Amino acid sequence: MMSLGLVGRKVGMTRIFTAEGDSIPVTVLDVSDNRVTQIKTVETDGYTAVQVAFGSRRASRVTKPLAGHLAKAGVEAGEILKEFRIDAAKAAELSNGAVVGVDLFEVGQKVDVQGVSIGKGYAGTIKRYNFSSGRATHGNSRSHNVPGSIGMAQDPGRVFPGKRMTGHMGDETVTVQNLEIARIDAERKLLLVKGAIPGAKGGKVFVTPAVKTKGAK
């Protein structure tokens, strides 16, 4: 069963210092204005979940069906809608229009962060898969950065699916697991997560409690 999480915006990276003077690299996430737009139950939808809106959007950019959906909940239109599967007991504590804040997490807690990685365009195998390049000289005239053989002979006579070749790199959903929350700024509604997370500055991310915590029995 999934847990309730937060939708956020990647502000950027910085570092903080511990009381002992150690430097910790952190990613700053803005998780303000997470508001509940719908509570789904087994009776009405066949499963239990909560739908959350994040950010803001001009009324002229909202479709009529979505505008009606948000008006029913009494919630301002958001930049993004995200659904989290939760148990019935947790859903009973929430209501439409309720704000989900940084108090959902605590310092030291492990979380999973999902985002969209930075797109790199069409890339070769050296950049995309860390292949080694060919020899610069000594008989190598036109095969410095080629991937090499991509198959066998007449049998099987084809390239196997999944062969690592050149192609589009980045711009895909990536989840980084077991990141630690180093600090919480409740006043500015910021989460400072230890380490790097996918995506560019301003990118949308989803933060949820870790599901595979290291060392857990």
Curated annotation (Swiss-Prot):
Methylated by PrmB. The keyword Cytoplasm does not apply. It comes from the Bacteria. GO terms for biological process: translation. GO terms for molecular function: rRNA binding; structural constituent of ribosome. Residues 134-154 are annotated as: Disordered. The modification N5-methylglutamine is found at Q154. This is Large ribosomal subunit protein uL3. It comes from Burkholderia lata (strain ATCC 17760 / DSM 23089 / LMG 22485 / NCIMB 9086 / R18194 / 383). The lineage of its organism: Bacteria, Pseudomonadati, Pseudomonadota, Betaproteobacteria, Burkholderiales. The gene is rplC.
